[in-house]
Amino acid sequence: MRKASYFLLLLLACMPVMAQQAGEQERNKQIARSFFEQVLDQGRFDQYAESHATDFVAHAGDHDATLEEDIAAAKEERKALPDMKVKVNQIVAERDLVAVYWTASGTNTQAGMGFPATGRKIKSDGMTLFRFKAGKIYEEWSVWDMLSIMRQAGLYPPPQ
């Protein structure tokens, strides 16, 4: 009985911490969703300051991008696909991490991202993992199928 009482007391003591973590995770998920819906889907690049830390880093292959470089890349994507729509399919959070599974689609009507304008419709799924610090997006890792994008744009031959 005594052990059960101690266990119950310990469990009750931990509940506020678990509730706080759950609240932070939900807040972080909402920040990530708002970033995708407002910045990437609607092109409201001024909203970066609302969601991202000033010392943000995007880990992109062989180059870590600063906040300014990440904003420039997002603007370049919007330039190449002016009608781009970005849909959040799924969001999962654990501790200070938020994973977003998304779909982007649009028409490549202007040169951008190193590609000429092709007039073709493009659709791609991707995954982004954010790390949060002090309520802001502090780090990002993103992956998507660039080969599929190039094939849809007619810039790379389809498989034989």
Tell me the role of every PLM-derived stretch.
Residues 17-50, 54-55, 156-160:
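Short, low-complexity N-terminal intrinsically disordered segments enriched in polar/charged residues
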Residues 5-16:
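Bacterial N-terminal signal peptides
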Residues 96-108:
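A short hydrophobic beta-strand element
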Residues 45-98:
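A solvent-exposed, acidic/Ser-Thr-rich amphipathic alpha-helical stretch
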Residues 1-2:
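N-terminal secretory signal peptides that target proteins for export/translocation
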Residues 106-134:
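Exposed beta-sheet edge and beta->alpha loop/turn motif
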Residues 139-160:
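Low-complexity, intrinsically disordered terminal/linker segments enriched in charged
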Residues 32, 44-49, 56, 70, ...:
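Hydrophobic pocket/interface hotspot
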